[in-house]
C-alpha cells in the first residue's frame, strides 16, 4: 500500500493484524522486510504491526534533494496521522531509532505508548566528553569515514536465510545507492539527540549489542543515568548491529516483555 506525503513523496507501507499498534522503522539503506522475524511474533501476541520503507529506500519514492533526516521524521508523523494510529509503540533500528529520537523532539505532544531504539547512540560524533559515538568518527573525520565505510562487517554471524529470502527480491527491484544518499547519512551523523532523551517522559528501551561494530553499548547506561525513570537498557550478547535479525529469539523476548509491561 502507498500514501503520499505533503511534499508528494510516495511511501510504501504494510499493515498486519489488529490490536495495539506497533510501528517498525528500518535504518539507513534498509528495507521494511528486515522485520520479518518480528511481524509474525507480534501478530501472534495480538498487536497490529505497521512497517514502511522510508523515503529513498525500498519501494518508496526517491527524493534527489534529500539531505536531512527531518523529512523522514515528518514522514513518520504523517503516516501515523494518515493511518489514524492511536498511541503506538515505535521501534526503530539504527537510523530508524534516530528518526524516533527526532520524532520525540519535534512532536512532543503526540501520544505514544513507548519506544524501543536498537543499537543507535543519540550522538554519533565522538568527543573527549562523549566517547560513545559511531566507531571512531569525529566532527573532523566523519564525512571521509562515512563515505569510505570500509570493510566493516555489520553482523557477527550473518543474516538468517529466511530474512535473506525476503530482502533479496526487494534489493534487486529497489537497489539502494549509498553514494546518492551520503547527504542524508552526514546529516544523521551530525545530530545530537541526548537532550531529547534526557527530557522524555515516555518509557524508552535502548537495546544494544555486545559485539556491535559501530557502537559501544555503554552509551545506553550513560543515557539511563540521565533519565532513570523513563530510560532502560538491555544488552544482547553474541550479536552485531542488526540485533533483531541476528538474535531474533532474544530480541523478541525482550520486545514482548517490554510491550506487555507498557500496554
Where are these regions (language model features)?
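Conserved alpha/beta-hydrolase catalytic His-Asp/Glu region
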Residues: 127, 132, 143-199
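Flexible "cap/lid" loop of the alpha/beta hydrolase fold
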Residues: 101-105, 112-144
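Catalytic histidine-centered segment of alpha/beta-hydrolase-like enzymes
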Residues: 239-248, 252
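Active-site loop/oxyanion-hole signature of alpha/beta-hydrolase fold enzymes
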Residues: 6, 14, 44, 51-91, ...
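N-terminal cap/lid segment of alpha/beta-hydrolase-fold proteins
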Residues: 1-10
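Conserved loop-alpha-helix segment in the C-terminal half of the alpha/beta-hydrolase fold
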Residues: 204-239
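Short N-terminal helix/helix-N-cap motif within the alpha/beta-hydrolase-1
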Residues: 32-40, 59-62, 125-126, 215-216, ...
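Conserved HGGG/HGGXW glycine-rich cap/lid loop of the alpha/beta-hydrolase fold
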Residues: 9-61
Amino acid at each position: 500500500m502507498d500514501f503520499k506525503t505533503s511534499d508528494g513523496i510516495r511511501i510504501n507501507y504494510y499493515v498486519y493484524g489488529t490490536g495495539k499498534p506497533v510501528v517498525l522503522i528500518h535504518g539507513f539503506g534498509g528495507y521494511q522486510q528486515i522485520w520479518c522475524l518480528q511481524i509474525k511474533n507480534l501478530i501472534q501476541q495480538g498487536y497490529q504491526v505497521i512497517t514502511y520503507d522510508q523515503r529513498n529506500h525500498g519501494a518508496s519514492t526517491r527524493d534527489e534533494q534529500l539531505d536531512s533526516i527531518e523529512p523522514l521524521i515528518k514522514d513518520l508523523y504523517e503516516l501515523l496521522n494518515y493511518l489514524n494510529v492511536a498511541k503506538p509503540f515505535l521501534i526503530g533500528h539504527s537510523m530508524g531509532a534516530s528518526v524516533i529520537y527526532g520524532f520525540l523532539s519535534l512532536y512532543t505532544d503526540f501520544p505514544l505508548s513507548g519506544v524501543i531504539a536498537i543499537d543507535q547512540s543519540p550522538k554519533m560524533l565522538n568527543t573527549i566528553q562523549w566517547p560513545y559515538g559511531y566507531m571512531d568518527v569525529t566532527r573532523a573525520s566523519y564525512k571521509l569515514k562515512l563515505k569510505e565505510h570500509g570493510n566493516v562487517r555489520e553482523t557477527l554471524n550473518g543474516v538468517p536465510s529466511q530474512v535473506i529470502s525476503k530482502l533479496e527480491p526487494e534489493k534487486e527491484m529497489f537497489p539502494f545507492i549509498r553514494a546518492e544518499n551520503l547527504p542524508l547519512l552526514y546529516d544523521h551523523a551530525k545530530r545530537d539527540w541526548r537532550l531529547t532523551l534526557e527530557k522524555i517522559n515516555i518509557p524508552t528501551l535502548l537495546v544494544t549489542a555486545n559485539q556491535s561494530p559501530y557502537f559501544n553499548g555503554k552509551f545506553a547506561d550513560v543515557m539511563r543515568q540521565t533519565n532513570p525513570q523513563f530510560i532502560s537498557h538491555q544488552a544482547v550478547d553474541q550479536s552485531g548491529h542488526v540485533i533483531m535479525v541476528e538474535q531474533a529469539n532474544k530480541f523478541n523476548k525482550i520486545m514482548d516483555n517490554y510491550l506487555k509491561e507498557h500496554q
